[in-house]
Amino acid sequence: MNHRKEKIESAMNMLENNMEFLCVTGVEDKLQDDVMDTIESLKNAGIKIWMLTGDKVETATCIAISTGLKSKTQRLFFLRDINNVQQVTEELEKLKFQSDYILIIDGGCLDFCLKQSESLFFEVTMNANSVVCCRCSPTQKAKIIALIKKHTDKRCLAIGDGGNDVAMIQEAHVGVGIVGKEGKQASLAADFSINQFKDLKLLLLWFGRISYKNTAKISHFVIHRGLIISFLQFIFSIMFYCVPIALYNGNLIVG
């Protein structure tokens, strides 16, 4: 249908006249505890955060503000309702010279950018403080993770709590699933499972760092141990005229 949006607005203007509200209801999807504090800690640790959601642009923008993803000094740039190459290129070129901003893009425009201006799009998004992708399908979420891995050498962590996040979680280097009201699909598909979003702070900034340091220590120990054993075996062989006799038995070397 041509001019669908204009025709819908015309029909609404024709029908929605002389009407009285009988009641007004609202639905609020409350944030979990300490979400803002967790995001602030992750940002202070130098972690760039992307929000990939199926919500509409207005809802996603409100969530980005309420969670602290956008600071008071940062500007919002919107990419939406674009369907031609020239306009996409012009908007992305403008953003190349901007700084300290949040990019908000809808699913239709995102799909168009990835098809027509993939390299330019990721050049722009890497300069943004954060990126909010709205109206994303599960396939788009996984594709974004794959393209970030392709265009950068960064490690990607994906976190979600619903079945729509499974593909994204499996595509990332590290997947974290939240056990929530939407079921356990995400947590079962993930590398790590947590109960609330705030647990991500402890997982990354405490257990993640401790595990990294312990792994480094074990690696150093194995390397040094191997060098010492090899050197002692070399000296032992020279002392006994290169006779093929082992200085240590197999159990000691393995242990």
Model-assigned labels for residue ranges:
Residues 1-52, 58, 85-102, 112-116:
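Signature of the cytosolic headpiece of P-type E1-E2 ATPases
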Residues 55-56, 136:
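Short beta->alpha linker loops
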Residues 41, 66-157, 162, 166-255:
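Membrane-embedded transport module
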Residues 25, 53-54, 178, 196:
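Conserved residues at the C-terminal ends of beta-strands
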Residues 57-58, 164:
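Conserved Rossmann-like nucleotide-cofactor binding loop
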